[in-house]
Amino acid sequence: MSDSADGGRQAGPAVDEGGDAGRSGIDGSETGETGADDDGGGPAQVSSPNYHNENHTAAQTCGWTANALRGEGKCYKNIWYGIESHRCIQMTPVVRCNERCVFCWRDHNGHAYELDGVEWDDPEAVVDASIRLQKKLLSGFGGNEEVPREVFEQAMEPRHVAISLDGEPSLYPYLPELIEAFHDRDITTFLVSNGTRPEVLRECDPTQLYVSVDAPDRHTFDEVVGAMEDDAWEKLLETMAVLREKSETRTVLRTTLVKGENMHHPDWYAGFYEQADPDFVEIKAYMHVGHSRGRLDRSAMPHHDEVVEFAEDVMEYMPEFTECLEVPASHVALLSKTLDTWVPKLKKGSDFWARDPVVGD
């Protein structure tokens, strides 16, 4: 039985939203072998008990989900955006990626990009699979004395999904429809993309859209991101224009800082960010976990104070951004135009929570 299924402490990296190490991982985990339980003939690179799949849909228990169930703290996305960590699914509709980021914890050798022959499930099937996988992953917490019964019952009714676990979600051909299918279930969506499919992102309206910007210039991009498509940089630039057009979707640019690789020219980053006119900018530290340890030395992992200093340097060139918030436990800083950063519908007393099947009116 897996550590998640029996309600124990999660082994391996607790990864959330596209590679962030959750608390269980970044505060001491030295293992990084992550894959999926092959429940339905899924990709070969996913084979650990904490990472389950049905066909091309995969889910993993985020370390912060486990922590929240045990009352041991919540993710920075709760602090800044209002996400209830114990009610958040971490999943992906496609375990394939068209980039080979040097800081990625995943195994590039087993991370296929070719999409030929994939039998794509329809969006409703992906939503159903995601919920089933989440319930399976968390089922054992119901017998854990550290987990209050009411908290466990809430976790069995997920209200958020982070479409970010692995691969590049925009390679799934029905991503806009998938987002709407989650919304139809009253589940908020937090989509993380590398920005290489602007034509897809233009059609997507998640609750919050994150795009990774891990280099301020083409040379650094080629060195750090390792894109498998020659026009990836140009596509990322096009995605910035797509984000600028978004009016109903909250937009976030996110940068993973790697010492000696991309921690330079904060003014260039600011100029790049401003092309998108994002609502927020997340700047976080590379975490020395998983397969990235074979590509980078531990010294490439910046300290939290270095992350905050770099974020403040960037903010000097972005006068509209007046707030630099931080969560030391996650080694992340947030640039914002306001202190009111929560998703409006996730604020306490909203209609969203009034409709909740567990805690609603």
Regions found by a protein language model. Name each.
Residues 96-100, 218, 288, 342:
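Short, acidic Gly/Pro/Ser/Thr-rich loop/turn segments
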Residues 144-298, 302-313:
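Conserved AdoMet/S-adenosylmethionine-binding subsite of the radical SAM
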Residues 1-95, 99-103, 107-136:
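Flexible, acidic/Gly-rich N-terminal and inter-domain linker regions that tether
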Residues 3-6, 12-35, 44-45, 54, ...:
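Radical SAM enzyme [4Fe-4S]-AdoMet core and its adjacent flexible, acidic
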Residues 86, 156-158, 327-331:
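Short Gly/Ser/Thr- and Asp/Glu-enriched loop/turn motifs at secondary-structure junctions
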Residues 63, 93, 165, 336-337:
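Pocket-edge structural micro-motifs
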Residues 125-155:
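Short Fe-S-cluster ligation motifs
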